[in-house]
């Protein structure tokens, strides 16, 4: 692990985490909003968080594929159509995995009617457990839990990193909210004209189908599970 990575991880656990994120996002926001809107043929994997999106993004060349690029900035402005159009042109990707767009799948489909949208289905109990475990891990790794504040509070009545501190009734409400989100997402996906739905365990069996869908050759299958896409900040 290089010094820059060690420094970044250290700062993420300090009170400097949020101001540094905000400064970086403000700089990137200006860059994005100066980008002219143009047609970029990006296909998206927007199934809910923790459904294999990083694996799918990382199997393709990182020069044309990314997992959750401009992460903090996108969560702040994901309901702004002008930002999303300029962001698409700014990133100039062919494949993007950003599961948080699942919460606005219908609006996303209307904004980009010619774009293919991939949804992967994971068993809901496995998915929920993975989300909870990830939130617990991130509780130890970062000081500012912006994912919970900017996204998960739109899904549940509680921040995602609070689950193991909640009482029994509140935990039941949290689980209900999460599973309702899971159901809504795939019900919506079935109504979208350019949506494609596959089960997570089928992904590695359908590499050629994914290559055709994204019009890209899979080049990185050996290391696809590593979340090493550039630009995830």
Where are the regions that the model predicts?
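Short His-Asn-centered micro-motif
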Residues: 45-47, 95-101, 120-122, 199-201
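Conserved nucleotide-sensing/catalytic segment adjacent to the nucleotide-binding pocket
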Residues: 82-115
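Surface-exposed cleft-lining segments at the edges of enzyme active sites
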Residues: 89-93, 165-178
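The conserved 3'-phosphoadenosine-5'-phosphosulfate
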Residues: 72-81, 124, 188-233
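PAPS-dependent sulfotransferase catalytic core
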Residues: 1-92, 143-173, 218-233
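Conserved phosphate-donor/acceptor-positioning beta-strand/loop module used by diverse small-molecule
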Residues: 111-133
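Short catalytic/ligand-binding loop motif for oxyanion handling, primarily in non-cytosolic enzymes
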Residues: 53-57, 103-106, 125-130, 136, ...
């Amino acid at each position: 692990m290089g010094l820059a990575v060690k420094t970044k991880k250290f700062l993420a656990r300090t009170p400097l985490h949020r101001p540094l994120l905000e400064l970086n996002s403000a700089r990137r926001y200006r860059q994005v909003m100066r980008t002219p809107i143009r047609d970029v043929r990006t296909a998206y994997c927007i199934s809910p968080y923790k459904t294999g999106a990083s694996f799918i993004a990382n199997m393709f060349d990182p020069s044309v594929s990314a997992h959750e690029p401009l992460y903090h900035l996108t969560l702040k402005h994901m309901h702004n159509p002008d930002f999303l159009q300029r962001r698409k042109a700014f990133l100039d990707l062919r494949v993007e995995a950003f599961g948080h767009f699942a919460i606005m799948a219908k609006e996303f489909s209307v904004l980009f009617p010619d774009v293919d949208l991939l949804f992967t289905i994971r068993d809901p109990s496995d998915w929920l457990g993975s989300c909870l475990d990830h939130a617990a891990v991130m509780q130890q790794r970062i000081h500012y839990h912006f994912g919970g504040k900017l996204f998960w509070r739109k899904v549940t009545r509680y921040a995602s990193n609070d689950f193991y501190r909640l009482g029994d009734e509140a935990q039941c409400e949290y689980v209900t909210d999460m599973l309702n989100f899971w159901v809504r997402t795939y019900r919506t996906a079935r109504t979208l004209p350019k949506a494609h739905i596959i089960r997570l365990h089928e992904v590695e069996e359908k590499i050629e189908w994914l290559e055709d869908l994204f019009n890209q050759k899979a080049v990185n299958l050996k290391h696809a599970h590593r979340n090493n896409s550039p630009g995830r900040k």
